């Protein structure tokens, strides 16, 4: 393969990947509007998202949400379950377009001493005797010749870059 062929093939592959990503995003957007279509017909007016939004603000700090608790946003947990049956009939795949509520749930009260949700991990030092070599050796690999290694080091140490005027 020549360099031009590699560049062209890479460009085509990147284009195909980008088109797939765009197609998935468009499909998700269509599903979202399909689910919201019936709700907008009931309201008959454009909602003001700054005032009437049912979505709680997403916080990057999980501790802030857990401190305030889900009681701060009482309508958030109930508004998404009140979809009309007509909206469900129009769009059968509406069940997956509801926003996740995992950021409003508190973690289970188990053991507060263990952080990061993991169990205690025991570390053991490994000695050379504990490590077993694979059966059959290393096949065609040879031992490193120290004379050849030092000769290669000297050859590279003597090489110098030469700059010329352009």
From Swiss-Prot:
Instruction: Quote a single Gene Ontology cellular component term.
Output: membrane
Record's subcellular location: Membrane
Q: Does the keyword Transferase apply?
A: no
Q: What superkingdom does the record give?
A: Eukaryota
Per the record, residues carrying Phosphoserine are 40
The alphabetical list of record keywords is: Membrane, Phosphoprotein, Transmembrane, Transmembrane helix
According to the record, the segments passing through the membrane are: 6-26
The protein depicted here goes by the name: Protein FAM163B
Whichever gene encodes this chain, its name is FAM163B
